[in-house]
Amino acid sequence: MTTAPDPVKLMKQAVAQTAAARVTSGAVVGLGTGSTTALMIQCLGERLAKGELANIKGVPTSFQASVLAKQYGIPLVTLDEVEKIDLAIDGADEVDPQKNLIKGGGAAHTREKVVDALADLFIVVVDSSKLVDQLGSTFPVPVEVLPMALTPVMRAVTRLGGEPQLRMGVKKDGPVITDQGNMVLDVKFAAIPDPAELEKTLNNIPGVVENGIFVNLAKVILVGELKDGQPSVREIS
């Protein structure tokens, strides 16, 4: 008895392959974090191994991205070693019609925002379930917080109408700790009518390092979809 392929995985694989095909030889590539981006990193490594690509350099946004890139033979550099990033490819937890994003399900949004903002072209790879009419519809806003400021930041976001919850680890006791050594609050808002304003307001709270709202950064959204049971990719630009 054969198991039917997972439709979500099929969509992610299709969009990962499409994104990896956008990378050209000699490019400096921002390597995002997450399940879809992990597949894209694998596709990049396969293109390198086949000789379809040469002399690319990756800028990882997390420990996970770094490990995967090394596993698939992608040379890595830091921001100190490059003058620019040609393109960044990253996932998202939500995408609204204006191409604003919520990111940070992998607790890597601080580094992701740095790398994605520096890229000449920021490509977002998602499956169709991540498209929403308004940010905050299905996913809370991740907020990275200095550990000593956790309590006052929770009070501040509550005054803004948010419902903060400390993200706890899986397969470990205690909270999730970011690559920077900080904690993450997942903040649920009833509505986010102005993502740009909320992004600024959250970042102005003392003790907040960065939040997962990304405004005016994404240039292209590649959406994995199923049509008649077959995976396809739709571009929003």
From Swiss-Prot:
GO biological process, one term: D-ribose metabolic process
Alphabetical list of Gene3D superfamilies matching this protein: 3.30.70.260, 3.40.50.1360
Keyword terms: Isomerase
Residues engaged in binding substrate: 33-36, 90-93, 103-106, 130
Residues annotated as the enzyme's active site: 112 (proton acceptor)
Pathway: Carbohydrate degradation; pentose phosphate pathway; D-ribose 5-phosphate from D-ribulose 5-phosphate (non-oxidative stage): step 1/1
Any one annotated GO CC term: cytosol
GO terms of molecular function: ribose-5-phosphate isomerase activity
Superkingdom assignment: Bacteria
Entry EC no(s): 5.3.1.6
SUPFAM superfamilies per UniProt: D-ribose-5-phosphate isomerase (RpiA), lid domain, NagB/RpiA/CoA transferase-like
Family annotation (Pfam families): Rib_5-P_isom_A
Isomerase in keyword set: yes
Record's subunit section: Homodimer.
Chain's role: Catalyzes the reversible conversion of ribose-5-phosphate to ribulose 5-phosphate.
Family the UniProt entry places it in: Belongs to the ribose 5-phosphate isomerase family.
Name recorded for this polypeptide: Ribose-5-phosphate isomerase A
Biological source species: Cyanothece sp. (strain PCC 7425 / ATCC 29141)
